[in-house]
Each structure stands twice: as structure tokens, then as C-alpha cells.
């Protein structure tokens, strides 16, 4: 798939990427000038950006997916899944990546705010995922609550930080069935 934009009132769609590679998970830069996205143009998923007005896409980081710019625009946060799912960041202008969080439940369950990061943490054996908050000011992580089921794909926090949205897997297993005489 490619990345497209369209005005919220409708109108003409604008194709922003044209690569035969898989491209997904677009997000805006805070100033609205760039669109960050995941692409496997090089054979593995990495972070790329393209001007919001159109133009050539350029690589930001060789590996990772599900990127989001910090509210101040200084960093791009993203998920690396190997050897384990973790949240990383890189300066927006380029540079060395830095590990932010090791214990992220999956690549779609974090939400950046000016004062920190809300995220679904990895659950201990026999438990479900805790929703946690990493404070940028103190560097400390606190548990907000623990889900009663397995965390799904997606987590966000309202602008006033009073309501949290998340998905959960109500059935995380499989059923085994035998069907006789199915012909």
C-alpha cells in the first residue's frame, strides 16, 4: 500500500508515496511539514519521511515501525521488535538512536504527550498488560492500572489526559474443532 492524504472536507486525494514496497502507519510531524511512515523498501521495515506537500521520501532510520514525532518535534519515537518489542527514539534531524522503554507490550500501544509516554507494558506470566506512564521529568514509570484481558493494538490518551483509549483481545486463543463428513 501507499500513503495518501485528503482534506477532511473531502476533495482530491494526493498520493504521497509510489514505491512497490509495503508502506503503512503514517503520522504527522508537529509542524505539519512531514509525514513519517514505515516502509520495507530496503527489505525490512524502517522509518521514512516524505514532505506533506509531496516529493521524494527519504529514510530516517534503517529499522523500526509505528513512528510518532514528539510534541516539540525534537525526536521521532518508534518501535523495534527484535530481539524484543521496545520503544526507541532518534533526533528528528538525524543521529544515533536511543532505547527509551524495553517493556512495551506491542508496537501499537503507546501515546506520546509533552510530559511523558503512556504505554501498555509487557505482562508477567499469568497476568494481563499493565497500562503505565513514563514521566520525562523524573524518568520514573508508574502503573496506572492493569487490564483484565490481553492488550490489543492501539492506545491513545485524550488531549486533557483524563481519558485513555485502548483495545483488548477478548479471545486470545483458538478453538480446535473436528468436522466429520465435510464433503
Specify the residue positions occupied by each region the protein language model found:
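Residue-level signal for well-ordered alpha-helical segments
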Residues: 5, 24, 37, 46, ...
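Short coil/turn segments at the loop-to-beta-strand junctions that recur within blades
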Residues: 19-24, 62-67, 103-108, 147-152
Amino acid at each position: 500500500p501507499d500513503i495518501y492524504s485528503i482534506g477532511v472536507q473531502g476533495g482530491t486525494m494526493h498520493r504521497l508515496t509510489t514505491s512497490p514496497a509495503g508502506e503503512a502507519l503514517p503520522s504527522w510531524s508537529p509542524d505539519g511539514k512531514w509525514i513519517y511512515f514505515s516502509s520495507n523498501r530496503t527489505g525490512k521495515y524502517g522509518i521514512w519521511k516524505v514532505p506533506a506537500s509531496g516529493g521524494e521520501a527519504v529514510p530516517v532510520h534503517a529499522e523500526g515501525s509505528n513512528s510518532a514525532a514528539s510534541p516539540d518535534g525534537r525526536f521521532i519515537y518508534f518501535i523495534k521488535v527484535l530481539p524484543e518489542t521496545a520503544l526507541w527514539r532518534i533526533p528528528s534531524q538525524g543521529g544515533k538512536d536511543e532505547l527509551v522503554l524495553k517493556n512495551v507490550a506491542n508496537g501499537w500501544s503507546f501515546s506520546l504527550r509533552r510530559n511523558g509516554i503512556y504505554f501498555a507494558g509487557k505482562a508477567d506470566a499469568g497476568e494481563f498488560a499493565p497500562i503505565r506512564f513514563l514521566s520525562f521529568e523524573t524518568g520514573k514509570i508508574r502503573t496506572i492500572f492493569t487490564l483484565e484481558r490481553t492488550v490489543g493494538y492501539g492506545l491513545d490518551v485524550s488531549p486533557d489526559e483524563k481519558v485513555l483509549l485502548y483495545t483488548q483481545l477478548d479471545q486470545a486463543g483458538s478453538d480446535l474443532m473436528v468436522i466429520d463428513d465435510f464433503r
